[in-house]
């Protein structure tokens, strides 16, 4: 039986890097747990106030992605890159 990553068609990389959810001149810290070509899995302290579309900044600005929320669960957010 194929694994979940095989079914998804894209390898997800466990990266555990600090990130910032940036929107409307504000920023919320997050942990980027997994990332792949089309999206990422984020962990946050609280989802309160996080909009459905935002910019994700990783590694102090070395990586930047416009993204939108695909799913939310407790402290985790799944996003797709635009």
Predicted segment positions?
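Structured alpha-helical
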Residues: 1-82
């Amino acid at each position: 039986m194929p694994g979940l990553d095989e079914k998804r068609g894209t390898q997800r990389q466990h990266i555990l890097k600090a990130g910032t959810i940036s929107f409307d001149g504000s920023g919320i810290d997050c942990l980027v747990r997994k990332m792949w070509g089309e999206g990422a899995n984020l962990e946050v302290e609280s989802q309160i106030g996080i909009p459905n579309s935002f910019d994700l900044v990783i590694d102090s600005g070395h990586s930047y992605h416009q993204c939108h929320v695909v799913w939310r669960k407790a402290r985790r957010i799944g996003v797709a890159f635009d």
